[in-house]
Amino acid sequence: MPEETLRVAALGRPFTLGMLYDTRQDKLIPGPSLWDRKTLQKNTDDTSQRSCNFHITASDSIDSKSSLLDVEASLKASFLCGLIEVGGSAKYLNDQKKFKNQSRVTCQYKTTTNFKQLSMTKLANLDEQQKGVIEKSSATHVVTGITYGANAFFVFDSEKLDASSVQEIQGSMEAVIKKIPSFDIQGKVDIKLTEEEKALTNKFSCKFFGDLILESNPATFEEAVKTYVELPKLLGEKKENAVPLKVWMMPLKNLDSKAPEVKAEVSTGLVKNVENNVEDLGTVEMRLNDCLADRVSKNFPQIRKSLRSFQRQRNNYTSALQQAIAKTLPSIREGKEDESSLKKLLEDREKSPFSHEKLSKWLDHKEREINVIGSCVDMMEGTNTKIVPNQSELDEEVLAPGVEDALCFVFTSLESADSCLKAMQNYSRSLELRSTDEEPWYYSNEVLTKMRKKAKAFHDLAKPLKDSSSVRFLATAIANEKHKGATIYHYNEGILVTDDFSKPPVPPVETIKDKSALMWYACDLSLDPETVNYNLILSDDNKKATRAAKQDYPDNPARFDVYPQVLCKEGLSGRHYWEVELTEDYNEDKGVGVAYKQIGRKGKQHINLGMNAQSWCFGVDAVKSQLFSGHNNKWVSFPLASIGFKRVGVYLDWPGGTLSFYNTESNTLTHLYTFHTKCTESVYPELDAS
């Protein structure tokens, strides 16, 4: 009984009528033919088969791509294991998103032109020479029909996105790309987009996979539209540039009973299992690329090294698995093996270090590690902290001329032993991902809490000193088993003082002479525009207040409405040091100090700094040319020293119950006055120009 004709996708392969084909290997057999060219031409029927389709898909799965190219299960299995090399538009099958967090939309243009087939009734009887050709080849089929036309795929990719915006961007991309056919006005390009759509299309790239030869491939949306409009012309006036799209093949067994044949096919379910495994390994690659593109892996070589090692192992395993399937598949089709051998290959993967579970778990761990490190780095934002990749560059920074002190936030556990990578490298010993009693440092709540606490402390140290030329703030990774997760190194004059920095104790406040004693207690303050009086103007990022004519500020409950005063935004407890620079104009009283948040804001009665129980003030009296201190409307006067009162340092020891003021000059401090008081809530630094 004659076997059924086989129908397969051409996939860019150079099929011709009468060509021999081995379906066990899915391999074209060029060279000897059963019939000469003249006989083939004489027995060929050519019929018109005009069609044109435009299709949009947001799926990037193997199944979706195979469907667009009309690839059936058996041929798909051969493609997945690398038995066949595709060309033309079918190269689209090999292309996948680089990142998991990336939007992709694909536009397919497909046209068919004609169908050619051999009239086999006159060719079915073979002579001995023709049968000899079959015997000498490995062919199982002969090409008897071909549908011609062309496929073109425009693949539009967004840039790498946050996971939360992938679906939204993809939907917007799909809506714009669906408009492409409407931009073709009788063979001319007329692109009409809103400003929002233009902004969107400017952010995604285009790749082209087609059967027609272009002068240059489109890389942008606009270029893609122009190419789309030109595609019908590229087929040629007589459609001479059309290529095989679909191929019909007759089993040679129908012509010669001794011809080789396919004994068995792999079941559709098992092909789907192969597809799932290949796709899973592809997803691993995308997640790896997401990790490699993260700033953490770019800044920390230890992370990048482990990712690259994992990537190499994954690539090697994927290649080995495909080669094993490519060897097994033809044997099953020839009847030398059954499906169980292919099933075993896939089952062995699940028992190996390359199982879905273990690869996913390794990536989960690495993504967690990157996120933990990234969260600490984020906490250093706005501090001019420099990330240095290695010990050599760290030494350069701490030994740089003019650098007296350097604090370095050190990630200490990035080079921890990775049992999963070891298992991959020693596949013969199938180790577990991690021993059950070993908790990765980045999953320890205790370690994470400590790291974030240190990162916050580092930020609070670095921000107020970010413009200091004598102090450097750095971040790096150095293995240190004593401090799991992270610690802070302190260098003084290029020498490591401690690998676990904490603020040094402060000497008695009246005895402090050197600013370095208070350096690590410096804080970064900003004046609060909501509280500024109408006769003050704020500038320099709310770091400076200047007396001025009355301003048209909106009224609000927090604003001082009579006296030129302003509070800072930051409420302080703990120990803090800051400095205030005053103009040398002694025609105006000036006061600096702190106040509780509930200090009065409206009217004249006891609102000034120091005139109430909610505030403490130290300043200069312009009329008497003397210094004064005040709290709860009790005032003490002091002579104004010859050095003046240009820059005042303020040290708040909230738990110790002191508020001290110093005249500052270069690195020298001169103690002026100390309030001894026990604060009951946070205090806000204040300036008073009244």
Q: Which residues make up each language-model segment?
A:
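Intrinsic disorder
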Residues: F79-G82, T268-V271, E275-V278, D294-S297, ...
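Beta-rich ligand-recognition domains in immune and ubiquitin systems
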Residues: K503-S690
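Polybasic, low-complexity association/targeting segments
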Residues: T16-P30, Y489-N492, D499-P507, N542
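Alpha-helical interaction segments
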Residues: T5, L11, R24-Q25, S352, ...
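Membrane-permeabilization and membrane-interfacing ectodomains
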Residues: M1-R333
